């Protein structure tokens, strides 16, 4: 709604009779008191389809593999959770899902990966970009660069790459 506010103020400052109205929507599905935000349904379907396609690629190989997919969601894990809708040949995809609403524990993550690899040769992991440790720090935090989007939010990225390194180490 920040953009709507700016446009409205600009129109008023130049004496325009244009009235600007905002329709709140977000594919993150994180608007309070809203069951499903406009845009979330199609984004959730896309995520589920993307994970199905990723599984098609991963499951053809006999070599054990761990595929980590970082999904948009700084403060709401709805899109990451939508990955649970993916299925291929009756198999659950992804096998592991980590949401930003629950504190992330690296040791538990490694245990989960090892347990999943005992059951299946290829595993797929969905992780929200905004997962945090119990002390509130972003996992694989790359916000230290100071870069921000046009709304002043620090860019988040790197959780997938960080977890890749963690899996490789252990």
Predicted feature descriptions by range:
Residues 23-36, 62-64:
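Acidic/polar active-site rim loop that often engages polyanionic ligands
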Residues 2-17, 37-170:
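Accessory alpha-helical/coil subdomains and C-terminal extensions
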Residues 19-21:
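Short hydrophobic alpha-helical runs that function as membrane-insertion/retention elements
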């Amino acid at each position: 709604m920040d953009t709507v506010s700016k446009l409205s103020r600009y129109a008023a400052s130049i004496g325009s009779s244009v009235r600007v109205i905002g329709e709140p929507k977000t594919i993150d599905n994180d608007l309070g008191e809203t069951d499903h935000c406009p845009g979330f349904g199609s984004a959730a379907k896309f995520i589920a389809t993307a994970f199905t396609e990723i599984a098609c690629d991963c499951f053809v190989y006999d070599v054990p593999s761990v595929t980590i997919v970082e999904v948009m969601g700084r403060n709401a894990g709805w899109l990451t959770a939508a990955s649970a809708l993916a299925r291929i040949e009756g198999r659950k995809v992804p096998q592991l899902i980590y949401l930003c609403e629950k504190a992330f524990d690296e040791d538990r993550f490694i245990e989960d990966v090892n347990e999943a690899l005992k059951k299946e040769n290829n595993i797929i992991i969905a992780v929200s970009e905004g997962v945090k440790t119990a002390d509130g720090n972003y996992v694989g935090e790359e916000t230290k660069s100071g870069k921000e989007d046009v709304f002043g939010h620090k860019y988040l990225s790197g959780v997938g790459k960080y977890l890749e390194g963690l899996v490789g180490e252990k």
